[in-house]
């Protein structure tokens, strides 16, 4: 079973090697930043590393909460899910597969997991007990426009649905071959919920009905909970937390930077270690 803090440590050690060879961090600042419709350039290893150091800890436990809910629902409703197929769309580093590993006690037999992403991410799982898995360099557009058929019973969007076009999402239900599936979507931003509306309308137009099983919206700051308290787990490593927060100190040219405030805003931020960004929905979809 994954030890999340060991995973964070491994990424941090690699990231430090990258930083040791950089005189300035201007490129990292611009390539790794979310703003407007700009998505970080995940083709670059350093961007993957910084993204995971900031968000992997919280995302793994958010997805664990989602899978735990799903498996408990199956147990209560006597649903036999052994041997099921899971499709993770926009899988990235496979964080939801690590989350599945944390739910290992729910899995009696083999589950088949497929992750697709246009980018071949590093830091993906190498071995997960009771789960057969594979990753493909593939985007949703190719999946829904080629002669593909989807037999997966669970379709997971890990913070990724906002990255896909409405046209591609509309085609997804036409590829579904199972009579009942479960849609699990974690939203990176509240505005991404509009993409869900498009997807659900397409399911209805293609002969499906849906039932919302769980809907967790983003909470206010005053209601956030530290994940290590919530789940009785190790806290995010303090030394790495402090380092990431003062990342701009690693820039050798920070003293002559023309826009130090911009550097602070884009580089210097704490990793997420609370449930403040938990924002997801789980839906049962049935063919009629």
For each feature predicted by the language model, list its residue ranges.
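N-terminal auxiliary segments of SAM/dcSAM-dependent transferases
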Residues: 1-34
């Amino acid at each position: 079973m994954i030890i999340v803090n060991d995973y964070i440590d491994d990424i941090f050690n690699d990231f430090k090697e990258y930083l040791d060879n950089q005189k300035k961090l201007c490129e990292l600042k611009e390539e790794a930043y979310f703003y407007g419709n700009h998505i970080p350039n995940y083709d670059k290893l350093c961007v993957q590393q910084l993204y995971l150091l900031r968000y992997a800890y919280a995302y793994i436990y958010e997805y664990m909460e989602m899978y735990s809910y799903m498996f408990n629902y199956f147990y209560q409703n006597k649903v036999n899910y052994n041997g099921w197929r899971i499709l993770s769309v926009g899988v990235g580093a496979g964080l939801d597969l690590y989350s599945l590993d944390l739910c290992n006690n729910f899995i009696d037999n083999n589950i088949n997991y497929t992750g697709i992403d246009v980018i071949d991410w590093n830091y993906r799982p190498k071995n997960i007990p009771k789960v057969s898995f594979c990753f493909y360099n593939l985007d949703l557009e190719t999946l829904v426009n080629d002669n593909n058929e989807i037999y997966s019973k669970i379709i997971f969007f890990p913070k990724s649905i906002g990255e896909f076009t409405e046209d591609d999402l509309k085609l997804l239900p036409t590829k579904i071959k199972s009579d009942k599936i479960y849609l699990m979507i974690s939203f990176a931003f509240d505005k991404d919920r509009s993409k869900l509306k498009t997807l659900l309308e397409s399911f209805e137009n293609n002969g499906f009905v849906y039932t919302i099983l769980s809907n967790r919206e983003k909470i206010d700051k005053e209601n956030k909970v530290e994940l290590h308290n919530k789940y009785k787990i190790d806290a995010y490593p303090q030394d790495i937390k402090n380092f990431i927060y003062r990342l701009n100190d690693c820039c050798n040219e920070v003293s002559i930077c023309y826009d130090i405030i911009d550097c602070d805003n884009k580089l210097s931020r704490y990793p997420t270690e609370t449930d403040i960004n938990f924002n997801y929905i789980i839906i049962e979809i049935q063919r009629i």
